[in-house]
Amino acid sequence: MKKIIILVPVYNDWQSVSKLIDEININVKGLDFEFSIIVVNDASTETQSLNIQNLDNLKSVRVMNMKENRGHARCIATGLKYIYENEDFEYVIPMDGDGEDRPEEIKFFLEEANYSPDKTIVGERVKRGW
């Protein structure tokens, strides 16, 4: 089974990240992949609190903590570097933690990746997630 890692940067918006993880869990149900989520905490000043309802369709949810606030792009770069060096995976899907990216689109990315395995798949947001 192919392994997918969803990479989510966050700064202080733990409520939105919790909602995103719940939505991902719902939307990956029945897909023939193993899903894990890595949340990269950009040195949030608010208490870290994930309130996740259900993880039935996810292998794991882990949080990486940045030592200092470095910004959205640096969180993604740090997460990608960590994944490349430490994880066994076929695909990485970066998703904003604030609802900008829609979890229901994951299946379309994976369909395209299976159809064109040697290509990088890029999406364009036309509608905010919620």
Predicted regions: what they are:
Residues 66-68, 72-82, 91, 100-130:
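Acceptor/aglycone-binding surface of glycosyltransferases and processive sugar-polymer synthases
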Residues 2-9, 17, 24, 35-40:
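Hydrophobic targeting segments
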Residues 28-33, 55-60, 88:
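Short helix-capping segments at alpha-helix termini
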Residues 4, 35, 61-62, 118:
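Short, conserved active-site loop motifs that form the nucleotide-linked donor/cofactor pocket
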Residues 13-28, 47:
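Short, well-formed alpha-helical segments that are part of the catalytic scaffolds
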Residues 41-50, 99:
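A conserved acidic beta->alpha catalytic loop
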Residues 33-43, 64-66:
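Short beta-strand/loop segment that forms part of the nucleotide-sugar
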